């Protein structure tokens, strides 16, 4: 139905909350306390790399480097050597630039309205006013316009990944059945693992000597960990994963999302232990188990609403005023005795029109907030006044309500998400490497 919100929108909301918390934690004075002074960063702007037809400058690296040092300092992490850190960050800037170029190439955009909504969620979720948020940005040495463009780029890369990776991943009902059966039969089936990882990436274009060199790099990282080196520092120095500068933290993951051979290793590990180097199609991995816990099996009862609605869209042909006037006329007809279903069939512009506007049983979160709030305010049999949502003007009628046990449905949805994430994880690094291999990248070496 056109008024339903998407899972993707919900995922964005969670992602930007994490992004905002990370951004607001950075303190401007930490860098001054670092063992690296501002003088350690090259002050002269110059071109350091050409990516297709665009350039990356020293100034761009300096800005990312400063924030990264701040973050590592906050984690009390011993910093890698400056030249190593700078090289790692340059590779990340190159990959980011390639993704943004690809998004532009296939026509992906982020509207100002989408951007404004995301920024409002960031500010609200962090319990800040707009003025307070601007002050935080100023303390970080940036401003709202620059922050907006950073967020626009992150949304574009998320949409690119959604279109080119996630949308191609299919999960069947049979896979869900098998997953749940295996989970029920496994002693560790209900466990979750908080893990961090290091990835030394390989690609199909590499010959045996190059792959062996990458293997030795991974083994060097593993040996550093065995000697007691901090995992966050080793991740920053050796890992090719996008989250390397955050210590490779992957958060909490159910066992079924990790896949073989990692599952066999993790079930026998204790928090703080690391795996030896493990090879996969995309590279060499090292995992660290941070914590483990049992997933709670909860009974979930929700209130569902059986509802109908009528939608009049606002478009180039129908102005806001005309749409509002028409929805008011339809409301008057219903108040004067016209059947809601007949009016919906004749006038609604939603896909549900042929069913008399019947939406079936609607669960919390299924619809956009404006629609849900208006629907929840109605008693069975009542019709709402006109309601404006991003899709247009609505009339909503509540038919009945019920309490529903959705535990099994949620369990299946959780299994679907876990399987989808595992499949996506298996191909996203390969996809990123393919983008990198197909791009023209030229490094500009500074003359001595």
From Swiss-Prot:
The organism is Nitrosomonas europaea (strain ATCC 19718 / CIP 103999 / KCTC 2705 / NBRC 14298)
Q: Which reaction(s) does the protein catalyse, per the Swiss-Prot or TrEMBL entry?
A: [protein]-peptidylproline (omega=180) = [protein]-peptidylproline (omega=0)
Q: Which residues form the PpiC domain?
A: 190-291, 302-400
Disulfide bonding pattern of the chain: none
Give the principal location in a single coarse category. periplasm
Would you tell me the protein name for this molecule? Chaperone SurA
Q: Which GO terms describe its cellular component?
A: outer membrane-bounded periplasmic space
Some GO term, biological process aspect, for this entry: which one?
Answer: Gram-negative-bacterium-type cell outer membrane assembly
Instruction: Name the InterPro entries on file.
Output: OMP_Chaperone_SurA, PPIase_dom_sf, PPIase_PpiC, PPIase_SurA, SurA_N, Trigger_fact/SurA_dom_sf
Q: Kindly indicate where the leader peptide sits in this chain.
A: 1-27
Function per UniProt? Chaperone involved in the correct folding and assembly of outer membrane proteins. Recognizes specific patterns of aromatic residues and the orientation of their side chains, which are found more frequently in integral outer membrane proteins. May act in both early periplasmic and late outer membrane-associated steps of protein maturation.
Q: Name one GO molecular function term.
A: unfolded protein binding
Quote the record's domain comment: The PPIase activity resides only in the second parvulin domain. The N-terminal region and the C-terminal tail are necessary and sufficient for the chaperone activity of SurA. The PPIase activity is dispensable for SurA to function as a chaperone. The N-terminal region and the C-terminal tail are also required for porin recognition.
Keyword check for Repeat, yes or no: yes
């Amino acid at each position: 139905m056109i008024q339903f919100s998407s899972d993707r929108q919900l995922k964005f909301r969670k992602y930007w909350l994490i992004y905002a918390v990370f951004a607001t934690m950075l303190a401007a004075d930490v860098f001054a306390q670092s063992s690296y002074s501002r003088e350690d960063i090259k002050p002269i702007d110059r071109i350091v790399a050409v990516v297709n037809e665009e350039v990356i400058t020293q100034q761009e690296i300096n800005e990312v480097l400063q924030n990264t040092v701040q973050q590592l300092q906050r984690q009390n992490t011993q910093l890698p050597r400056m030249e190593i850190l700078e090289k790692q960050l340059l590779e990340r800037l190159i990959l980011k630039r390639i993704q943004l170029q690809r998004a532009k190439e296939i026509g992906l955009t982020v509207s100002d309205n989408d951007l404004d909504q995301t920024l409002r969620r960031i500010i609200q979720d962090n319990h800040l006013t707009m003025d307070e948020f601007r002050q935080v940005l100023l303390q970080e040495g940036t401003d709202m316009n620059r922050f907006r463009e950073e967020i626009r780029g992150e949304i574009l890369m998320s949409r690119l990944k959604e279109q080119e990776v996630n949308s191609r991943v299919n999960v069947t009902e049979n896979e869900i059945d098998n997953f749940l059966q295996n989970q029920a039969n496994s002693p560790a089936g209900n466990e979750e693992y908080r893990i961090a990882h290091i990835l030394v990436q390989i690609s199909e274009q590499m010959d045996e000597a190059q792959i062996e060199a990458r293997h030795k790099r991974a083994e060097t990282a593993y040996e550093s960990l065995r000697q007691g080196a901090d995992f966050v520092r080793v991740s920053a120095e050796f890992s090719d994963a996008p989250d390397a500068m955050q210590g490779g933290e992957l958060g909490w993951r159910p066992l079924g999302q990790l896949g073989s051979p990692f599952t066999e290793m993790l079930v026998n590990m204790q928090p703080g232990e690391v795996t030896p180097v493990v090879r996969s199609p995309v590279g060499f991995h090292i995992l660290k188990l941070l914590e483990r816990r049992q997933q709670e099996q909860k009974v979930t009862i929700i209130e569902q609403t059986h509802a109908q609605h009528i939608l009049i869209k606002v478009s180039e042909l129908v102005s806001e005023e005309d749409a509002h006037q028409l929805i008011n006329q339809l409301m008057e007809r219903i108040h004067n005795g016209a059947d809601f279903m007949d009016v919906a069939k004749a006038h609604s512009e939603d896909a549900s029109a042929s069913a008399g506007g019947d939406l079936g049983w609607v669960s919390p979160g299924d619809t956009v907030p404006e629609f849900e709030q208006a629907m929840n305010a109605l008693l069975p049999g009542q019709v709402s006044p006109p309601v404006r949502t991003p899709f247009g003007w609505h009339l909503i009628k509540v038919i009945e309500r019920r309490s529903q046990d959705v535990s099994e449905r949620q369990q299946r949805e959780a299994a679907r998400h876990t399987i989808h994430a595992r499949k996506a994880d298996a191909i996203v690094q390969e996809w990123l490497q393919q983008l990198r291999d197909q791009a023209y990248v030229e490094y500009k070496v500074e003359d001595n």
